[in-house]
């Protein structure tokens, strides 16, 4: 398992700030405007959607755009990020063996997403499960990792990272009953953006842990929301010929769309997070939510290039 810090990650320097602004009254001063993003988010908010957004300039360490970024909302599959951090920390400390084999039959079946459920391989090593979790949002692989490290350990890691508005509540489930947690995970846009900024600046646990988690996240195949504006190949975008540095993670559930990541080009680098909780009453409601993410992606590309 490669645990060396990435050189391009080290080149992105930024401090974290806790400044917040309510939607939607702040855009990048003196640089690119986020007018289109603000309009798209205003339209969503007017339709009753709950929105939390944060963009931070990595070089300046200042807020570029913030709206209700302190509000805790469901983040669906983006909750695997602290799980991956705990797994990487376990590898580094020797508490976990990356090649330890986990048998699928020992994990309760879940079909909400991912590919392991469709593979013939009945068992995989922890390191491969981490790759599946990051790359394909594999719920079964994530549950296997969570069963191995334990929910208390991930919650302790979240507390250690200072994420007071984030929580991993439960396993992935096909259906949530009255005795189950209502969501897989919770978070705020500010904390999500901070975590991704810290990852590329080698500040999460240690440089090697940060590099490992950033590497896993760089395999993510879901470039359909904010990342759709990058023009990157969903299946091969680790080394972009145009000098674009990009990692992201998305979260999806009924009426929930979330994306957080880092986007850096020759002009600037940003960490970003957008959470939208909406009434998924029709395809038009869903597409309107998706469109807001894509508009943000276009504005971010203009900002970094």
Residue positions per predicted region:
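Short, glycine/proline-biased beta-turn/loop segments that scaffold the active-site neighborhood
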Residues: 93-119
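Conserved catalytic neighborhood of penicillin-recognizing serine enzymes
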Residues: 109-143
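Active-site SXXK
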Residues: 61, 74-102, 272-274
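Short glycine/serine- and small hydrophobic-enriched flexible loop segments
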Residues: 85-93, 147, 194-201, 302
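A short glycine/serine-rich beta->alpha loop
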Residues: 66-74, 115, 119, 178-181, ...
């Amino acid at each position: 398992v490669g645990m060396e810090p990435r050189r391009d990650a080290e080149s992105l320097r930024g401090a974290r700030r806790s400044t917040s602004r309510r939607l939607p009254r702040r855009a990048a001063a003196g640089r690119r405007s986020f007018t289109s993003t603000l309009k798209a988010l205003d339209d969503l908010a007017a339709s009753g959607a709950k929105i939390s957004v944060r963009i931070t300039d990595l070089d300046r360490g200042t807020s570029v755009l913030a709206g209700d970024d302190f509000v805790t909302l469901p983040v669906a599959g983006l909750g695997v990020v602290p799980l991956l951090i705990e797994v990487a920390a376990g590898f580094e400390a020797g508490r976990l063996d990356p090649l330890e084999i986990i048998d699928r039959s020992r994990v309760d079946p879940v079909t909400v997403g991912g590919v392991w459920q469709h593979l013939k391989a009945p068992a995989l090593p922890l390191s491969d499960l981490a790759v599946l979790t990051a790359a394909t949002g594999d719920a079964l692989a994530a549950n296997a990792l969570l069963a191995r490290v334990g929910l208390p350990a991930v919650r302790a890691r979240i507390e250690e990272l200072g994420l007071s508005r984030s929580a991993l509540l439960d396993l992935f489930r096909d259906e949530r009953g009255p005795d189950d947690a209502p969501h897989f995970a919770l978070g705020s846009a500010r904390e999500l953006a901070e975590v991704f900024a810290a990852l590329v600046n080698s500040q999460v646990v240690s440089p090697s842990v940060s590099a490992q988690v950033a590497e896993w996240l760089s395999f993510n195949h879901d470039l359909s929301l904010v990342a759709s504006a990058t023009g990157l190949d969903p299946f091969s975008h680790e080394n972009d010929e145009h000098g674009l540095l990009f990692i992201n993670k998305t979260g999806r559930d009924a009426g929930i769309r979330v994306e957080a990541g880092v986007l850096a080009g020759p002009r600037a680098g940003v960490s970003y997070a957008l959470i939208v909780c909406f009434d998924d009453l029709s395809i038009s409601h869903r597409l309107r939510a998706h469109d807001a993410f894509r508009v943000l992606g276009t504005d971010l590309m203009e900002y970094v290039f």
